């Protein structure tokens, strides 16, 4: 909480070796019965009365990622917002985009079970598969493309799809992590005058997201489709990795 970046709210860029991304990356994480958290006075938030552990489970991440992505995307009530990817992070991004009440939201996802999840829980959201996305967005936007695009998929083709589906002067927020370098074809993009926003989540809004959960404005519980005890955590990992049984997110009980 004392370095330049922490004081600016950019806590993921903390310059201390035990700050920022340390927990679960450079030091042991939270999948244990007891956890030691450096700088806990800065990095932990009290769960409000009336909010269960299960309701709060996704606040630190991936809800923090979705909230940050929606916040920096400058969404207005007149916007058409396209979200690429309907995995756990994509759905959390959707929940936080909905807080800004844009004119319409389109979710693009290739997995049929995840598309069905979106249709079942958020019927007001338009859905489309990647091969139809560009034409669908043009047909369902007011200015030839999405006003805001949030790239949450991280597939080989989704970065290009993101800027192709954006209207001129749109905002493209890249939330996804990629396995390899992406090409930025500047000659093709030049006339679109796009604004790109990228980077890791600054988990500094957890107190606000907990308040929104307490007020009933965010509900991530439907994302927790499976629960395992800590002694069977390897089974939960395998289920999640192989995307079996319609899994979205797995909870671990200690």
Each model region followed by its residue ranges:
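Glycine-rich phosphate/adenylate-binding loop and adjacent beta-alpha elements
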Residues: 1-43
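Glycine-rich cofactor phosphate-binding loops and adjacent beta1-alpha1 units
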Residues: 73-77, 98, 103-106, 115-195, ...
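Rossmann-fold dehydrogenase core element
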Residues: 171-173, 184-223
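Conserved acidic E/D residue at the C-terminus of a beta-strand in Rossmann-like folds
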Residues: 109, 176, 200
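A general structural signal for well-ordered alpha-helical segments in protein cores
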Residues: 32, 44, 63-66, 90, ...
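C-terminal hydrophobic helical "lid"/dimerization subdomain
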Residues: 110, 135, 160-164, 203-254
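Mid-domain Rossmann-like dinucleotide-binding core that forms the NAD(H)/NADP(H) cofactor-binding site
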Residues: 46-131
